Structure formats: C-alpha cells, structure tokens
C-alpha cells in the first residue's frame, strides 16, 4: 500500500524537530450539496528545523516516530527537504 502524501501549511514550529501542519480539505454536505472546508492538524517530523510558520509543506506517512508523530516533512515551498533532498540528489 502506498504512503499517503498530504499538503498543508505550518501553523506551529515551536517544538524541536517537529512542526504542526494544518491540512484543509473540501467535503460536500450530503443534504445541501454545498462544499465545506474541513481541517485537521498533524504533527510532522522536521529533522533540520528548517520549516517556519506559514510555509507550504508536503508531508508523507511514515512509521511512528513518537506517540503523536507518524508523518515526515518531504518538501518545503516546493523544494525537497532532508532525506528526500539527499535521495533526489543521488
């Protein structure tokens, strides 16, 4: 099964090696057929502490890193980050 990949905005970078990413999605209301915005926050691993508040990031599912972290930041503002950048360069 492929790893899930989500795109969202960094809303907190206060933790060491961790960022909080807000992912928004649009869902149609079953009765009124109007699109509603739903959002969820994910704790994602940021090894180099390179992400800042407001950055647009891509996160990828990974094995659990801690109790709440099971996502890894793979790209920041369209540029690969960390292990993803090394794999792409090699």
UniProtKB/Swiss-Prot annotation:
Example of a GO MF term: structural constituent of ribosome
Keyword Nucleotide-binding: no
CDD domains xref list: Ribosomal_uS17 (cd00364)
Signal peptide: none
Membrane-spanning residues: none
GO CC terms: cytosolic small ribosomal subunit
Xref: Gene3D superfamilies: Nucleic acid-binding proteins
Protein task: One of the primary rRNA binding proteins, it binds specifically to the 5'-end of 16S ribosomal RNA.
Matches recorded under PANTHER family: 40S RIBOSOMAL PROTEIN S11 FAMILY MEMBER, SMALL RIBOSOMAL SUBUNIT PROTEIN US17M
Subunit structure: Part of the 30S ribosomal subunit.
Designated name of the protein: Small ribosomal subunit protein uS17
Organism lineage: Bacteria, Pseudomonadati, Pseudomonadota, Alphaproteobacteria, Acetobacterales
